């Protein structure tokens, strides 16, 4: 788990949420550097959450951000299970409906930005509503 120095100079452990938030900020900056535009972060819809919503041209990009210290158990990308994909699809469907859209009317895709150790992997169109 990442650490941050306290005022006294001794490190304290970050919570899982703080660590996740920090990697989401890193992913946002990295994607913006690749030309995507930020729309929203930590979008909650009926119990599901989407880490980032970005735009690439006319495409709405729903982004799941994952971090693992090592690839020992498959790395960060491998942690996006079918169950997690289903929850992301449902959350995106609800978000689109709230914004007067649907998978039929809005060009969108689901990407994963996976940080494993110091490596970053951007998996465009990692899964879709037909998976």
UniProtKB/Swiss-Prot annotation:
Domain of life, per lineage: Bacteria
InterPro entries in UniProt: Restrct_endonuc-II-like, tRNA_endonuc-like_dom_sf, UPF0102_YraN-like
Q: Where is the composition biased (Polar residues)?
A: 1-19
MF annotations from Gene Ontology: nucleic acid binding
**Family in the record:** Belongs to the UPF0102 family.
The protein's matches in NCBIfam families, at most eight in alphabetical order, are given as: PRK12497.1-3 (NF009150), YraN family protein (TIGR00252)
Tell me the protein's name. UPF0102 protein YraN
Source organism of this protein record: Escherichia fergusonii (strain ATCC 35469 / DSM 13698 / CCUG 18766 / IAM 14443 / JCM 21226 / LMG 7866 / NBRC 102419 / NCTC 12128 / CDC 0568-73)
What's the name of its gene?
Answer: yraN
């Amino acid at each position: 788990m990442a650490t941050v120095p306290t005022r006294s100079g001794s490190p304290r452990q970050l919570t899982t949420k703080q660590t996740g938030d920090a990697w989401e900020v890193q992913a946002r900056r990295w994607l913006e550097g690749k030309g995507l535009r930020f729309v929203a972060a930590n979008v909650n819809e009926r119990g599901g959450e989407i880490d980032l919503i970005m735009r690439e041209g006319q495409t709405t990009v729903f982004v799941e951000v994952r971090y693992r210290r090592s690839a020992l158990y498959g790395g960060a990308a491998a942690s996006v299970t079918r169950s997690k994909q289903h929850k992301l699809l449902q959350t995106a469907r609800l978000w689109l409906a709230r914004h007067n859209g649907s998978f039929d009317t809005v060009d969108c895709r689901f990407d994963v930005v996976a940080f494993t150790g110091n490596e970053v992997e951007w998996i465009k169109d990692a899964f879709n509503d037909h998976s």
